[in-house]
């Protein structure tokens, strides 16, 4: 598999799928909750892997 395809599948595709999923939600409240949950997860992983474990 060529490298650009792999980068697209691993890097870009999940982002675009999540963006489409959030955009198509029925209410702005659901969009905000879902986007906030994703942001909270990212912040928690950054704190764990960067701050506590020192990997970043």
Curated annotation (Swiss-Prot):
Main location: membrane
Keywords (A to Z) from UniProt: Cell membrane, Membrane, Transmembrane, Transmembrane helix
UniProt superkingdom: Archaea
Keyword Cell membrane: yes
Membrane topology: Multi-pass membrane protein
Subcellular location: Cell membrane
GO CC term (a single one): plasma membrane
Annotated TM spans: 5-23, 33-55
Designated name of the protein: Uncharacterized protein AF_1327
Originating organism: Archaeoglobus fulgidus (strain ATCC 49558 / DSM 4304 / JCM 9628 / NBRC 100126 / VC-16)
Upper lineage: Archaea, Methanobacteriati, Methanobacteriota, Archaeoglobi, Archaeoglobales
